């Protein structure tokens, strides 16, 4: 119902992480990272599957040891979502997980050894068609750059990133994406802006170590929102000191808010006041939990009175406008029914599920007609 945002995406090259296209206009991929011990195969698999259920396109797994690499082999066999192996210092781990079917390597070429070891990893990645993510972080800048700049700056992060890019360029390897993360919003944003002007490769966005569920979501929404609104970014991760599942939910909420990528229900709800005719807050909270399984994109407005309710309902897939004892239900901008305020949650859940099924069937028919 609402128009898509007129955001002009930055042009970038195309790579694939497993079967997920990255860059060159592909949908912005949302990813997270496991926080289990990788050697605990069962716990890690369970967490990855939980991330899959809420829509994760890609999942990163830390592989710090050879034991973790052996566990990675077993994990990879039990999940469907593409996996990125996060590797530092030991090039042999990168070679090992490449044998085990890793979909992407997250490394910094500068910290896995000498030129020959870098070449071995890159040659292996090329032979097995595995992309690489260069991950620069303000908290782990090279010592000489810390001394040169005195502190992490956008120019320092850019210089670090370009060093790693140059490593891959010298080896004639172009299947990579880059990130320049920082916990400071403005440092991260300016670093990405500078990098976006220097290279054509896809960019992975993130505000690193953003904080807990609430503060981290706010920082990420501001930082990623600024970049995405400028067309910068091909994949993203919302880094939270919280359940990784929340990272995926917040990531999609950011994309939905910018009308870049829709997944599931976009709830539009008033903050409530004394004019509300039913429990708006309780209704929204209950429906968000009950309807997490719905992936059909739709706007649902839940407004407690007639001041703004009708206007929001006009541009929503489904909309409720609070009234005395009964509230008006709108579908595609047209008033269709009245719902009992005392049974609002159950009635609205039923209507939303029915509408989702209707929209899914309509899209299925459209696809079949196109294929004919």
UniProtKB/Swiss-Prot annotation:
It catalyses: (2E)-4-hydroxy-3-methylbut-2-enyl diphosphate + oxidized [flavodoxin] + H2O + 2 H(+) = 2-C-methyl-D-erythritol 2,4-cyclic diphosphate + reduced [flavodoxin]. InterPro entries: Dihydropteroate_synth-like_sf, IspG_bac, IspG_bac-typ, NO2/SO3_Rdtase_4Fe4S_sf. Keywords: 4Fe-4S, Iron, Iron-sulfur, Isoprene biosynthesis, Metal-binding, Oxidoreductase. GO terms for biological process: isopentenyl diphosphate biosynthetic process, methylerythritol 4-phosphate pathway; terpenoid biosynthetic process. Its EC number is 1.17.7.3. Its cofactor is [4Fe-4S] cluster. The keyword Iron applies. It is an enzyme of class 1 (oxidoreductase). GO terms for molecular function: 4 iron, 4 sulfur cluster binding; 4-hydroxy-3-methylbut-2-en-1-yl diphosphate synthase activity (ferredoxin); 4-hydroxy-3-methylbut-2-enyl-diphosphate synthase activity (flavodoxin); iron ion binding. Binds 1 [4Fe-4S] cluster. [4Fe-4S] cluster binds at residues 270, 273, 305, 312. Pathway: Isoprenoid biosynthesis; isopentenyl diphosphate biosynthesis via DXP pathway; isopentenyl diphosphate from 1-deoxy-D-xylulose 5-phosphate: step 5/6. Belongs to the IspG family. Converts 2C-methyl-D-erythritol 2,4-cyclodiphosphate (ME-2,4cPP) into 1-hydroxy-2-methyl-2-(E)-butenyl 4-diphosphate. This is 4-hydroxy-3-methylbut-2-en-1-yl diphosphate synthase (flavodoxin). The gene is ispG.
